[in-house]
Amino acid sequence: MSSGSAGAPALSNNSTNSVAKEKSGNISGDEYLSQEEEVFDGNDIENNETKVYEESLDLDLERSNRQVWLVRLPMFLAEKWRDRNNLHGQELGKIRINKDGSKITLLLNENDNDSIPHEYDLELTKKVVENEYVFTEQNLKKYQQRKKELEADPEKQRQAYLKKQEREEELKKKQQQQKRRNNRKKFNHRVMTDRDGRDRYIPYVKTIPKKTAIVGTVCHECQVMPSMNDPNYHKIVEQRRNIVKLNNKERITTLDETVGVTMSHTGMSMRSDNSNFLKVGREKAKSNIKSIRMPKKEILDYLFKLFDEYDYWSLKGLKERTRQPEAHLKECLDKVATLVKKGPYAFKYTLRPEYKKLKEEERKATLGELADEQTGSAGDNAQGDAEADLEDEIEMEDVV
């Protein structure tokens, strides 16, 4: 397999992207459009048949019956074959095909670089291909001669580059002015109007002829992959792993409170436990109700009423019911209640033992009064019933 058939030359849109050569004063070899030349559409061949170079329409079909394979190469192999040292028609490798056509192998020459695999598996991705061709194009002899002269003289090439930059700036200004004057008259049907109302003109250039030829007709589309049996295959895999490691995504690392290591250069606000750095949570709703301090006597009476309802209260619950500042509420709580530290009612307040006794005595006294009232009412009811029975037992006599 030679380099000419392995890599297809790039296609060039020759008919649409072309310029004309300026008649005088052009030492750079670049093609410019002079003011004296007539501007015409190089794509409109029917109306400008006599003005187009005949060479630009010639297509070499000598190798049109030649069958070529369109191959997709790995990046490292394509870069090696793209080197100019490998583009002199020398043999790059051989293709080995089994008799039944089940396996196709590409073998590179042994004298090539040992850093890449020499054995590849070639897979047919599309066996039958229609209407695909490979083209090549070259400059005509007069343009090739100018190119060789510039390559032979570096100083002349440098002057040509500087001259090219100056002429490009001048050419842009002249072309813009010329288009505004002439293009509207000659190509009214080619003028387009943008949304902002300004006219936009399609650029018209003169076609530069190229020597175009068909390299061959594509008959198969293939893909080349390194063979796992090749000893250099593991080198390619290792290179890819290193590329992946170097291109890792950025990670977010949270700061820990390790004294003298990660937090040594941070401020006091970052080191304290109250820091909100990287903390996720909902913001607390701000209460618009302001707490007004009540007299201690009223708070104590209200606390006794609350402890009559439930024996155990949390500080949060008492604060919601009393609506007092926490410091003021704690000061009053410490006088009548104690905080439970263990058990099922841990971290809740309950009345002190002495107040519990008074509470029980008051409850018993209240229950005793209720019992006496119930007993007195029961005696009155019994006496009334006895008097009613006596009245029933007295016999009444009729007086005549």
From Swiss-Prot:
It is found in: Nucleus. Residues 33-47, 386-400 have a biased composition (Acidic residues). It comes from the Eukaryota. GO terms for cellular component: nucleus; transcription factor TFIIF complex. One of its GO terms (molecular function) is DNA binding. GO terms for biological process: regulation of DNA-templated transcription; RNA polymerase II preinitiation complex assembly; transcription elongation by RNA polymerase II; transcription initiation at RNA polymerase II promoter; transcriptional start site selection at RNA polymerase II promoter. Residues 174-189 have a biased composition (Basic residues). Its main location: nucleus. Residues 1-19 have a biased composition (Polar residues). SUPFAM superfamilies: Rap30/74 interaction domains (SSF50916), Winged helix' DNA-binding domain (SSF46785). The modification Phosphoserine is found at S28, S34, S56. Keywords: DNA-binding, Nucleotide-binding, Nucleus, Phosphoprotein, Transcription, Transcription regulation. Residues 1-47, 165-194, 366-400 are annotated as: Disordered. TFIIF is composed of three different subunits: TFG1/RAP74, TFG2/RAP30 and TAF14. Present with 520 molecules/cell in log phase SD medium. Belongs to the TFIIF beta subunit family. TFIIF is a general transcription initiation factor that binds to RNA polymerase II. Its functions include the recruitment of RNA polymerase II to the promoter bound DNA-TBP-TFIIB complex, decreasing the affinity of RNA polymerase II for non-specific DNA, allowing for the subsequent recruitment of TFIIE and TFIIH, and facilitating RNA polymerase II elongation. This is Transcription initiation factor IIF subunit beta. The lineage of its organism: Eukaryota, Fungi, Dikarya, Ascomycota, Saccharomycotina.
